[in-house]
UniProtKB/Swiss-Prot annotation:
Protein name as catalogued: Small ribosomal subunit protein uS9
GO biological process, one term: translation
GO cellular component: cytosolic small ribosomal subunit
Segments traversing the membrane: none
InterPro entries listed in its UniProt record: Ribosomal_Su5_D2-typ_SF, Ribosomal_uS9, Ribosomal_uS9_bac/plastid, Ribosomal_uS9_CS, Ribsml_uS5_D2-typ_fold_subgr
Domain of life: Bacteria
Family in the record: Belongs to the universal ribosomal protein uS9 family.
Pfam families cross-referenced by the UniProt entry: Ribosomal_S9
Length: 161
């Protein structure tokens, strides 16, 4: 590399490689051999594997209808948020396997997986899902228990006498 002795030489050396303006990252459709988009979603201790394919809007979780797997309406609403936000209610069939955690974490993991799979299937949906916060991994996990404490932060009962 040539020696640079002055500021003018430095500006000449750096001006040769100007960055391209208006560079937009290209998102390509990612499908498997059966025409499905696959993604994994995580929330707390739950990990979900999600496949989406064109269909009638059927959702199957661990080989059960999602109405039977998630009895609480709040969990069903959480799970359907990315589909409703993108107006794809009846366009995709969703198959998910989920393990670990409780029902709330599992619903969040499936929601995260559906969002990622939708972006793999239709990359133009990414800005909508990103704006809604569906693509962001919720990194909050349970705080570990500390020794000398009853729980993570709760102390044992204190007695003066």
């Amino acid at each position: 590399m040539a020696e640079i002795n002055s500021l003018s030489e430095l500006s000449m050396a750096t001006s040769i490689t100007e960055p391209h303006e208006n560079v937009v990252p290209v998102h390509v459709q990612k499908l498997d051999s059966q025409g499905r988009a696959y993604a994994t979603g995580k929330r707390k201790d739950a990990v979900a594997r999600v496949w989406i394919k064109p269909g009638s809007g059927k959702i199957i979780i661990n080989n059960k209808e999602f109405d039977k797997y998630f009895a609480r309406p709040v969990l069903r609403m959480i799970l359907r948020q990315p589909i409703v936000a993108t107006n794809r209610d009846t366009q995709f069939d969703i198959v998910a396997t989920v393990a670990g955690g409780g029902l709330s974490g599992q619903a969040g993991a499936i929601r995260h997986g559906i969002s990622k799979a939708l972006t793999y299937y239709e990359p133009e949906l990414r800005p909508i899902l990103k704006k809604g916060g569906f693509l962001t991994r919720d990194s909050r996990v349970v705080e570990r228990k500390k020794y000398g404490k009853a729980k993570a932060r709760r102390s044992f009962q204190f007695s003066k006498r």
